A protein has these predicted regions:
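FAD-binding core of FAD-dependent oxidoreductases
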Residues: 9-24, 85-95, 123-138
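Active-site rim beta-loop-alpha module in soluble metabolic enzymes
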Residues: 164-224
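ATP-binding N-lobe of GHMP and related small-molecule kinases
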Residues: 1-86, 100-108
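Alpha/beta catalytic cores of group-transfer enzymes, especially the acyltransferase/condensing modules
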Residues: 110-158, 245, 251, 255
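DPxDG-like acidic metal-binding loop motif
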Residues: 27, 88-112, 133-138, 143
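Glycine-rich, charge-dense phosphate/pyrophosphate-binding loop(s)
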Residues: 14, 201-259
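Glycine-rich beta-alpha junction loops
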Residues: 27, 136, 164-169, 216-217, ...
Length: 259
């Protein structure tokens, strides 16, 4: 018996929406889960991750405990195109797939809110896992242990171009450079930019996107970890074809929005 789960890559933060906003994109990882008589087999990933510390396996275990799935052995096969540690939600694909896989064996794969709660518990924040589960553009709020997510339809004529560099940047390192506090003026700017960005995506208001994607919380700091980040952003800012650009997730991928 097997279950196959396809999960989209996600682009989180979208400039000012740090740990809040995320977007599902048309790049996918596919995971196959097969129940075995014994043992654990993990295929399609680097050998150092093919063990019980594997993120997909840990997520499957969480999901199995939640739904009461009793199994003796498991084979996980990973196939896909989402690059690792590039700011496109590769870890979220693993987490969401593992939980959904376990839920599916109990025919409970449509319990999206429960899947979201478990995925956020593992990931620590909902900005990547929410769009991977609900699709489209999502905004999420965490209050204690409860996650509230809204999936928002955006104009389909927008296209997202990912500038993926040939190097990685871990989320841990990217978070380590963030400030502990934010000046009031910067906080107000980010809130206003987030509101403008979301409204512009919903209504197809091109003129609001370049300003709406601007950020004062994480990009000014993370940009120093990425070769040529600021010159690239300046070039995209001047390009009339580009409606807006931002650092995808923790980086180093830069996402540009065009029609």
């Amino acid at each position: 018996m097997f279950v196959k789960v396809r999960v989209p890559a996600t682009s989180a933060n979208l400039g000012p929406g740090f740990d809040v906003a995320g977007l599902a994109v048309t790049l996918y990882n596919t995971f196959t889960f097969e129940l075995l008589d014994e043992g654990l087999e993990i295929l399609g990933c680097p050998e150092q991750f093919a063990n019980k510390d594997n993120l997909t396996y840990r997520a499957f275990e969480e999901g199995a405990r939640y739904v009461g799935l009793d199994y003796k052995g498991l084979r996980i096969t990973n196939e896909g195109d989402v690059p690792y540690t590039r700011g496109l939600g590769s870890s979220s694909t693993c987490i969401v797939a593992g939980i959904v896989g376990a839920f599916a064996f109990k025919n409970r794969y449509e319990e999206r809110q429960n899947i979201l709660e478990l995925a956020t518990k593992i990931e620590g924040h909902p900005d990547n896992v929410a769009p991977a589960i609900f699709g489209g553009l999502t905004v999420s709020v965490m209050e204690e242990h409860k996650v509230t997510t809204l999936s928002i339809p955006v104009k389909q004529e927008y296209r997202y171009v990912a500038l993926i560099p040939p190097f990685t940047l871990s989320t841990e390192k990217a978070r380590s450079v963030l400030p502990q506090t934010l000046e009031r003026a910067d906080a107000i700017k980010n809130v206003s930019h987030l509101a403008l960005m979301v409204a512009s995506l919903i209504n197809g208001y091109d003129e609001g996107l370049k300003l709406g994607f601007k950020d004062r919380f994480h990009q000014p700091y993370r940009g120093h970890l990425i070769n040529n980040f600021f010159p690239i952003m300046e070039t995209l800012e001047k390009d009339e074809r580009v409606l807006g650009a931002y650092l995808s997730g923790a980086g180093p991928t830069i996402m540009a929005l065009i029609r």
